[in-house]
């Protein structure tokens, strides 16, 4: 058996559910590459600096970064790619002999399945739910690739969202909106959703087994607002058919599953680390089979 020569991994909090190890280890096995991908659960933000220092010292070849640390890691890296610098969020770290470079592959990963709708999106409003790094990646992808007239960013905490946007150079395309206004029936908020061509869930709401007291619904919005002209994009990938995706299909809307972004960003990260193209369709088949067989 080939002994792993290089370590890859995912840092985040409460990430035992992640399918990233399945994706990357499958790809490495298919290509007979001497890498192993594992999970590094980081309990709190104050441990990020020593964790990054440890990765540097131990020669870990590369890392993915997920919620809630995509912005936290930035000060501890040596270099940022242009797309990571533009939103101040990193989801991929490459270790080149102790020099740590941060990238954001979420942007291209998010954009890929939306490309068939590019002409429809141009000049129309879109809505994004969330106030973390994934939401920022979606906003930047819309700006770079699709040119909507504006992005309605629906959040629960406007102060937190304002802080997130503070260093985002292109924040003028974003209009902050409160999710509570949707659920209370505020007409302006409802009109924004109805006018939006694309609706994106960039929150964990709908993730299998994750509902808690602060997420009283398994849906980010009242799905009665959905209509056949919408394109509904749920970044959640487990379950494969989330409550939002099911409701969107029932309304006649076009839908995009979270596995598309998951695989898109993973393929780019994999290429940055290994210099090889991920065997995407074979990995997709393994991932879908795993998700469908999960309880």
Curated annotation (Swiss-Prot):
Q: Name one Pfam family in it.
A: Shikimate_dh_N
Biological or metabolic pathway of the protein? Metabolic intermediate biosynthesis; chorismate biosynthesis; chorismate from D-erythrose 4-phosphate and phosphoenolpyruvate: step 4/7
Q: Does the keyword Zinc apply?
A: no
Where is shikimate bound in this sequence? Answer: 18-20, 66, 91, 106, 237
> Which residues are noted in the entry as NADP(+)-binding?
130-134, 235, 258
Annotated EC: 1.1.1.25
Molecular function (GO) terms for this protein are: NADP binding; shikimate 3-dehydrogenase (NADP+) activity
Keyword Protease tagged: no
- Catalytic center at which residues? 70 (proton acceptor)
Q: What Gene3D superfamilies does the database record attribute to this sequence?
A: Leucine Dehydrogenase, chain A, domain 1, NAD(P)-binding Rossmann-like Domain
Specify the superkingdom. Bacteria
Q: Catalysed reaction(s)?
A: shikimate + NADP(+) = 3-dehydroshikimate + NADPH + H(+)
An example Gene Ontology biological process: shikimate metabolic process
Give the EC class as a word: oxidoreductase
Task: Quote the InterPro entries the UniProt record gives.
Answer: Aminoacid_DH-like_N_sf, NAD(P)-bd_dom_sf, SDH_C, Shikimate_DH, Shikimate_DH-bd_N, Shikimate_DH_fam
CDD domains for the chain: NAD_bind_Shikimate_DH
Instruction: List keywords of the entry alphabetically.
Output: Amino-acid biosynthesis, Aromatic amino acid biosynthesis, NADP, Oxidoreductase
Subunit text: Homodimer.
Task: Quote the function comment for this protein.
Answer: Involved in the biosynthesis of the chorismate, which leads to the biosynthesis of aromatic amino acids. Catalyzes the reversible NADPH linked reduction of 3-dehydroshikimate (DHSA) to yield shikimate (SA).
Q: What is the similarity comment for this entry?
A: Belongs to the shikimate dehydrogenase family.
Q: Which PANTHER family match?
A: BIFUNCTIONAL 3-DEHYDROQUINATE DEHYDRATASE_SHIKIMATE DEHYDROGENASE, CHLOROPLASTIC, SHIKIMATE DEHYDROGENASE
What is the name of the protein in this document?
A: Shikimate dehydrogenase (NADP(+))
> What is the scientific name of the source organism?
Chlorobium phaeobacteroides (strain DSM 266 / SMG 266 / 2430)
